[in-house]
Amino acid sequence: MAGTQTRTTPAAGWLSIVVPVLDEAAGVVAALQALAPLRECGHEVIVVDGGSRDGTPALAAPWADRVLSSERGRARQMNTGAELAGGEVLLFLHADTLLPAGAAAAVRAAVATGTAWGRFDVRIAGASAWFPVIAAFMNWRSRLTGIATGDQAIFVQTALFHRLGGYAVQPLMEDVELSRRLRKVSKPACLKERVLTSGRRWETRGVWRTILLMWRLRWAYWRGASPEVLARAYR
C-alpha cells in the first residue's frame, strides 16, 4: 500500500535504496547525506515514514527522491517503498546504518554473477570492546546459516522480491523470515564490505543483556513462537 509522495525526482537507476524511518530527526539528515554520492550516480533513495512526530519526513525530503508515508511497522514500510521503486535491485537500509564506499559496485558485481540476493558484513559503532566480537559472530553466523539481518543491509533483485510477496507483515524477525524464503531460491552473496550500524541498542540496554535477549528471541522464533509475542518481549 503506497503512501503519500512528497518528492518526485525521477532518479531511479538500477539500484533503489529503501530507508524505513520512525522519529529519526536526530540522525536522518546525516544518514541520507551519506547516500548523496549514490543519488548523483542515478540511484534512487526512497524514505518511508511510519508516522513520525518529530518532523522526520520534512528533514528527509531534500535528501531523498521520494518520501512516502505508510502504516507503522518496518515490514510494511519497506514493502511500501519497494512498490514504487524503479531499480532492478532493492537495498533495504536502516536509518542508523551507513553503507561502505563502493557499495553499489559491490552489489553490482554480486548480481552480475547471477546472485539473486545478499547482504553486507557489519561492524558496530560504539566504544564497547565487545562490538567487534559481536559483529564478527553476526557475520559468521550469517555465512553459516544463509540468514541475513536488517543491520546487514539486505539487497535483492526487485522482480524476485515481488514474486515472493515482499516482507511478511510481522513486528519482528521480518528479515529472518524473508531470508528463509530467499535462501530456497539461492544462497546469499555475503559481501565482505562492511556497513556501519549504530551500537545504541546494546549501549542502552547493556551489551550482555542485549545479546542474551536476542539469542532467546531468535531461539524462540525458530521453535515457532509468534512474532507478536516476541515483539512484546523485545520492547
Regions found by a protein language model. Give the residues of each.
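Acidic helix N-cap motif at the loop->helix transition within catalytic regions
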Residues: 26-30, 54-63, 102
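Short, acidic, metal-binding catalytic loop of nucleotide-sugar glycosyltransferases
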Residues: 33-42
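Short aromatic/hydrophobic "clamp" motif used to bind/position activated sugar donors
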Residues: 90
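Hydrophobic helical membrane-anchoring modules
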Residues: 1-10, 180-235
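Conserved donor nucleotide-binding strand/loop of the catalytic core
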Residues: 43-46, 57-84
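Conserved donor NDP-sugar-binding/catalytic core segment of glycosyltransferases
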Residues: 101-130
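Cell-envelope/extracellular polymer assembly enzymes that use nucleotide-activated donors
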Residues: 14-16, 44, 177
